[in-house]
Amino acid sequence: NRRWARLAVFICSLFVGMGQIEAQETYHTQIYKPKRIKSLQVVQPDQTFTVPVISLGSGEQILINFDDLTPNYERYAYSVIHCDADWKKSSLNELEYMQGFQGLTIDDFANSFNTTTQYTNYQLLLPNDDVQLKVSGNYAVRIYHEDHPEETVLVACFSVAESEVGIEAEVTGNTLIDTYQRHQQVNFSVLKKNLNITHPQTDLKIRVVQNNRPDNVVRKIMPSGILSDRIVYENLRELIFPAGNEYRRMEFLSSKYNG
């Protein structure tokens, strides 16, 4: 039986007409002022270890949380940027992907209390009453000081999904490299539902991400099989990930038996 993989598998198939401009900045979650800004988190509220993905129109929100190592409130502002499948700014203008205003300040903050180092914690929830998202895709939130908008303080990235296709996936220790040792194999199928996928090699943009890590994203994945109702990606060498000790299986079996 197949199970949903704990390894995040993102199917970026709906970036139609969102052009990519060469030499554009590639966005990823990053602190640009590391001596001052700490503890950046981009999560769903009350779900610290989840991948930052919400469903379009579901009422779900993304929480952007960070600390500033100063005791005073700073007027941090934010802008929301719609990105393509490669996390570059898409060709959509603001009116097409959001309803609301850019450059609003982050007013949800709290000062530290009885701590060795004084700091101020800031929180931003998106979407909110001032900013609504109209389309699915990848989003980058650029945060900067209101008095210095040209200087980026941090970038927080998340995705908004639509259930246009289904995904069945599994992670197994039985790989082409070894069996239940140091690697894991990801297999998955894209269920077409009612979506017309004529040429999956070009119609689908697949990204496989291990534990939300930006450093080993697998791209340009070709299917191993094309069926009437699904596109299959199985036993592909590029979908084998080093697992290490954290993902090894342990067998609690005794070697002692009664004679």
Q: Each predicted region: which residue ranges?
A:
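Low-complexity, Pro/Ser/Thr- and charge-rich linker/hinge segments at domain boundaries
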Residues: T26, I31, V160-H183
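Contiguous beta-strand segments within globular domains
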Residues: K33-H82, D178-K192
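Short, aromatic- and glycine-rich surface loops/edge beta-strands on solvent-exposed regions
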Residues: Y78-V80, G137-Y144, E238-G259
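Ligand-binding face of N-terminal immunoglobulin V-set domains in extracellular IgSF glycoproteins
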Residues: Q118-E146
